[in-house]
């Protein structure tokens, strides 16, 4: 929604929501950001499979650095508030009957369940790594009609992490330390 004095206001509208009554049937993105900030959760990752979702991605993103044990420890120690949306602010979500859902959900499943988003095969999938994977694969599957957006909602330095395999650098560090304590994830 365009604001009278410039800028935009975004809403998450459920499939049964009423676009004429946004205040009662949707979630204001500013409120979602406020909830994220006051939440006691250490890591939050929003995955938004919705048309025009790009307005939600407000932070910056970077290239995926090499994931050493120290790097994994740092990004899991710090808080994170991240978001990956199915497309840009002016894009519809592409669905095909043979997929059974959207290009975003198809590739989210492939990326996490099959480990395809684990670009360096270390058994750890970061939200940034997942965002890079989804951006590439959804753009291809949607014939360039939809490009996922990803980034941080706040300036916090942490990262949401999926442990895909038991044979990860995190678990290797624990074994090398000969310590029964796991890293503080």
Where are these regions (language model features)?
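Cysteine endopeptidase catalytic domains of the caspase/legumain-like
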Residues: 1-185
């Amino acid at each position: 929604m365009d604001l009278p004095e410039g800028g935009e206001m975004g809403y998450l509208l459920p499939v049964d929501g009423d676009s004429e009554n946004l205040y009662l049937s949707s979630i204001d993105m500013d409120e979602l950001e406020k909830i994220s900030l006051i939440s006691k959760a250490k890591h939050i990752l929003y995955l938004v499979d919705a048309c025009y979702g790009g307005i939600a991605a407000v932070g910056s993103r970077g290239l995926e650095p090499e994931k050493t044990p120290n790097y994994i420890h740092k990004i899991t120690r710090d808080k994170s508030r991240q978001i990956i949306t199915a497309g840009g602010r002016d894009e519809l979500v592409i669905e095909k009957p043979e997929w059974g859902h959207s290009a975003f959900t198809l590739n989210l499943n492939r990326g996490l369940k099959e480990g395809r988003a684990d670009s360096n095969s270390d058994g750890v999938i970061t939200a940034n790594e997942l965002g890079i994977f989804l951006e590439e694969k959804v753009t291809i599957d949607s014939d360039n009609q939809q490009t996922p957006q990803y980034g941080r909602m706040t300036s916090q330095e942490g990262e949401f992490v999926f442990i895909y395999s038991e044979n990860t650098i995190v678990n290797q560090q624990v074994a090398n330390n000969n310590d029964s304590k796991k890293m503080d994830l």
